[in-house]
């Protein structure tokens, strides 16, 4: 929700700071990335995330967009090359995000959902 007079955009669970995003069953990593990119249209405003402190959009780039792009690109390439899910998950290097809260709980699950999404997209 954009509140122009306050120069604020409420981003909710599209934006994460300091913690790993939770990719959930039925979610869509590709659409999430596009939605994040669409937030750039609001320019120099303050964004209120679902998790973390309000900040400029650039503050959410690493823990949200960069992470989701890594998941999406790695899994899409793996599916395209015929790599099975376990091998794709094993070869995914998420270590640069390991200091984010929830990493131990979510990294594997997120990779699994991202692979399944990429696999489903390959049939479209």
Positions of predicted regions on the chain:
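Aromatic side chains
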Residues: 10, 16, 67, 97, ...
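Divalent-metal (often Zn2+) His-rich catalytic cores of metallo-beta-lactamase-fold enzymes
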Residues: 8, 30-83, 87, 91
């Amino acid at each position: 929700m954009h509140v122009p007079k306050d120069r604020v955009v409420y981003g909710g669970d599209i934006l994460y700071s300091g913690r790993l995003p939770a990719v959930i069953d039925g979610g869509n990593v590709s659409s999430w990335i596009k939605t994040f990119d669409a937030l750039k249209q609001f320019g120099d405003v303050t964004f209120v995330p679902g998790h973390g402190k309000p900040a400029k959009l650039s503050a959410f780039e690493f823990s949200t967009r960069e992470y989701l792009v890594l998941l999406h690109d790695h899994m899409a390439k793996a599916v395209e090359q015929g790599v099975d899910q376990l091998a794709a998950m094993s070869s995914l290097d998420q270590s640069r995000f390991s200091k984010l809260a929830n990493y131990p709980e979510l990294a594997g699950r997120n990779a699994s959902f991202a692979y399944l999404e990429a696999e489903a997209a390959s049939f479209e």
